[in-house]
Amino acid sequence: MKRLRNKMTTEELAECLGVAKQTVNRWIREKGWKTEKFPGVKGGRARLILVDTQVCEFIQNTPAFHNTPMLMEAEERIAEYAPGARAPAYRQIINAIDNMTDIEQEKVAQFLSREGIRNFLARLDIDESA
């Protein structure tokens, strides 16, 4: 089953629902959905849709939603059956990100989008070959 994330591009939402991107863009304008700039894309045309309760309710009432059996409700958490199986580094990174402010998280996301993981590791002085 597919899962709606809390932020999606128009292309991702259109693909999930099986409609055209133009249809999703029209819904954004008509319904006044909240959007934000997509980090790392020049020109300001790429936008992220903030999938809130208003968006979820509208999507659930569309015929496209009912004709798509692979779609679940937004923001449903995936059950983690083996929480202790994660590597310590993974847990530390997640904890660090959880402790960041929204602005700090956005800056990290922009940096990773712009520079990539290799430059991120290089900034941390971590050698890939080791």
Swiss-Prot record:
Pfam families: YfeC-like (PF07037). SUPFAM superfamilies: Putative DNA-binding domain. GO terms for molecular function: DNA binding. It comes from Escherichia coli (strain K12). InterPro entries: Cro/C1-type_HTH, DNA-bd_dom_put_sf, Lambda_DNA-bd_dom_sf, YfeC-like. It comes from the Bacteria. This is Uncharacterized protein YfeD. The gene is yfeD.
